[in-house]
């Protein structure tokens, strides 16, 4: 069996209290971006969920540095995958004794950072 050289690290954030559509706006923005640039963009982003994405990205960078010994200056975000998680269903009372259902969506986020060669 051939031992493959692992030059990527991952991190995940599960059950984030935001819809996957809103989370994917931020995830698509940072895909294929250098980690240093993505951290700056997430710090000053007006989106509420950007703080959670930044924490997940910092976790992936820490995994790359501590577990694999990768150079953090050459890390690039290769994957930022957003998935649906559970849906909390709530009831909202309405007029004339009726009620409607409110769905509160949750999402999962998976980030992969890879060390790229300088060219």
From Swiss-Prot:
The keyword Ribonucleoprotein applies. InterPro entries: Ribosomal_uL22, Ribosomal_uL22_bac/chlpt-type, Ribosomal_uL22_bac/org-type, Ribosomal_uL22_CS, Ribosomal_uL22_sf. Keywords: Ribonucleoprotein, Ribosomal protein, RNA-binding, rRNA-binding. CDD domains: Ribosomal_L22. One of its GO terms (molecular function) is structural constituent of ribosome. Gene3D superfamilies: Ribosomal protein L22/L17. Signal peptide: none annotated. One of its GO terms (cellular component) is cytosolic large ribosomal subunit. GO terms for biological process: translation. NCBIfam families: rplV_bact. This protein binds specifically to 23S rRNA; its binding is stimulated by other ribosomal proteins, e.g. L4, L17, and L20. It is important during the early stages of 50S assembly. It makes multiple contacts with different domains of the 23S rRNA in the assembled 50S subunit and ribosome. The globular domain of the protein is located near the polypeptide exit tunnel on the outside of the subunit, while an extended beta-hairpin is found that lines the wall of the exit tunnel in the center of the 70S ribosome. Belongs to the universal ribosomal protein uL22 family. Part of the 50S ribosomal subunit. This is Large ribosomal subunit protein uL22. It comes from Rickettsia peacockii (strain Rustic).
């Amino acid at each position: 069996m051939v031992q493959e050289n692992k030059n990527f690290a991952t991190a995940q954030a599960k059950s984030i209290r935001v819809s996957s559509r809103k989370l994917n706006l931020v995830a698509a923005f940072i895909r294929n971006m250098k980690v240093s640039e993505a951290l700056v963009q997430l710090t000053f982003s007006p989106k509420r969920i950007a703080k959670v994405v930044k924490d997940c990205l910092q976790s992936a960078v820490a995994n790359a540095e501590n577990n694999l010994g990768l150079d953090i200056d050459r890390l690039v975000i290769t994957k930022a995958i957003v998935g649906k998680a559970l849906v909390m269903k709530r009831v909202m009372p309405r007029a004339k004794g009726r009620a409607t259902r409110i769905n509160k969506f949750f999402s999962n986020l998976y980030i992969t950072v890879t060390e790229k060669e300088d060219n």
